[in-house]
């Protein structure tokens, strides 16, 4: 039972860990879609992820935004109303989060019932060719460079130029006419060179040149057409503007993951850069810094800038495995040729719930090994005992007698002559002045009491007292008392 519970917990942990990662496709996708002209179609983007991904749609490499009036980006996918022939092409849903991105691809085919009705009277082969009663081969028109026609929505600034191509072939050789907003263009607007009639050149664009340009290619067998949408925009006259409330102050757990967002509105695609303020005293950690508003900042790596349907641009800064040094002020900087704007936010990183173990203080000995606990006091006692023993042995050595020979002077019979006087260093228990006074008192007691009193008064100094009595030639008797001192 315990083993099964452990395996169950391990599986739950593994599932929770695996949930965080790049976006993934959550449902089956039918990549080839078809729709009839004038109808409505919805292309789904069934992706999921943790954290939830951001999605954007592209058609033939061009980002779909709010200017595409018949296109609407929903939470579930892309909705196209009143489908036109030029809506055919390749669509991509790109989903991205902080761990990566994934794409969902579609190929949209637009079915034109009216064209098929016109051609229904003509016996066609599978490739648009047929043979008449005389045996001649005929072929309806077809575009020979479809790869150069994928980009159907084109934006250009005022004063620039653009070329719209509709190169086609057929048998008999087809003709081509150009229309703007369903009105034929004049010959001088197209050009008289037949070799260039398949390409429409628009030079020195003006705002009034915006519109839908259609090429109609036809022969006796059939007809094809293609439409381009041209947007002529005024050159930018203002610096970028940061919209919304982002970036906002954020708090993250130690080791966790968080992000800052930055939404910038600009007439042209701006440069979005993230900066982090360099805290005082940490300048040496960075190779280069920049000054913004009188403060030093370091430039951070920046990911892809996304174009949003509302015409704004979005960028995200991901912070993974947050540490204490990640805390501080962050700046989102949006710039174009006219200037820049920025906005700041602060990141707070909560303390590590499991900080590294601190060094054990000297007062705490519970975590020290037992050999150390026993060895240190034992070593100290051994050293102290050795020093104490050495001092005791040193103090037991006898003091050297004075170098000069004792001088014998005649003394009265009742006086005591002290032949040896201890050194000051040998008298450790009394001071020298007390010793002299006691010595005089000792001698005044007479020879009979002196030895006994001396041994009582100085038990550690007087170790041997003896008396010598001898007579000289002159008949005088001298008595000497010898006292042996020992420290």
Curated annotation (Swiss-Prot):
The gene is FGFRL1. The chain crosses the membrane at residues 372-392. Residues 393-487 are cytoplasmic. Disulfide bonds join 45-93, 166-215, 262-332. SUPFAM superfamilies: Immunoglobulin. It is a single-pass type I membrane protein. It is found in: Cell membrane. Its main location: membrane. This is Fibroblast growth factor receptor-like 1. It comes from Gallus gallus (Chicken). Residues 115-125 have a biased composition (Polar residues). PROSITE patterns: IG_LIKE. Expressed in cartilaginous structures. Has a negative effect on cell proliferation.
């Amino acid at each position: 039972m315990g083993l099964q519970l452990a395996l169950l917990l391990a599986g739950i942990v593994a599932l929770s860990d695996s949930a965080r990662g790049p976006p993934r496709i959550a449902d089956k996708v039918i990549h080839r879609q078809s729709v009839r002209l004038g109808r409505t179609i919805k292309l789904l983007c069934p992706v999921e992820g943790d954290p939830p991904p951001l999605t954007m749609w592209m058609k033939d490499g061009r980002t779909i935004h709010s200017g595409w009036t018949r296109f609407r980006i929903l939470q579930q996918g892309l909705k196209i109303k009143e489908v036109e022939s030029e809506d055919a092409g390749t669509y991509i849903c790109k989903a991205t989060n902080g761990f990566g991105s994934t794409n969902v691809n579609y190929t949209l085919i637009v079915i034109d019932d009216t064209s098929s009705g016109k051609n229904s009277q003509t016996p066609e082969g599978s490739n648009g060719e047929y043979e008449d009663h005389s045996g001649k081969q005929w072929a309806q028109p077809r575009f020979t460079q479809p790869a150069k026609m994928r980009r159907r929505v084109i934006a250009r600034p005022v004063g620039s130029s653009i070329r719209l191509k509709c190169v086609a072939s057929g048998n008999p050789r087809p003709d081509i006419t150009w229309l703007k907003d369903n009105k034929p263009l004049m010959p001088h607007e197209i050009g008289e060179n037949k070799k260039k009639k398949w390409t429409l050149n628009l030079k020195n664009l003006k705002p009034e040149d915006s519109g839908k340009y259609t090429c109609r290619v036809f022969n006796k067998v059939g007809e094809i057409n293609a439409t381009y949408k041209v947007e002529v925009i005024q050159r930018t006259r203002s610096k970028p503007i940061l919209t919304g409330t982002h970036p906002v102050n954020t708090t993250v757990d130690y080791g966790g993951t968080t992000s800052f967002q930055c939404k910038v509105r600009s007439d042209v695609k701006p440069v979005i850069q993230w900066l982090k303020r360099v805290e005082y005293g940490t300048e040496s950690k960075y190779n280069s810094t920049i000054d913004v508003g009188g403060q030093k900042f370091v430039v951070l790596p920046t990911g892809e800038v996304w174009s949003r349907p509302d015409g704004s641009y979005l960028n995200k800064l991901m912070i993974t495995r947050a540490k204490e040094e990640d805390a501080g002020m962050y700046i989102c900087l949006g710039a174009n040729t006219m200037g820049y704007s920025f906005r700041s936010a602060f990141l707070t990183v909560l303390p590590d719930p499991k900080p590294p173990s601190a060094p054990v203080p000297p007062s705490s000995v519970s975590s020290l090994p037992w050999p150390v606990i026993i060895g240190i006091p034992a070593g100290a006692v051994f050293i102290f005992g050795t020093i104490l023993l050495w001092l005791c042995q040193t103090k037991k050595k006898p003091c050297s007698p004075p170098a000069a020979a004792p001088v014998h002077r005649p003394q009265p019979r009742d006086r005591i002559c002290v032949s040896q006087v201890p050194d000051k260093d040998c008298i450790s228990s009394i001071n020298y002045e007390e010793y002299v006074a006691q010595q005089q008192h000792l001698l005044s007691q007479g020879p009979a009491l002196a030895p006994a009193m001396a041994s009582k008064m100085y038990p550690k100094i007087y170790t041997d007292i003896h008396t010598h009595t001898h007579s000289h030639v002159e008949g005088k008797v001298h008595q000497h008392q010898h006292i042996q001192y020992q420290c």
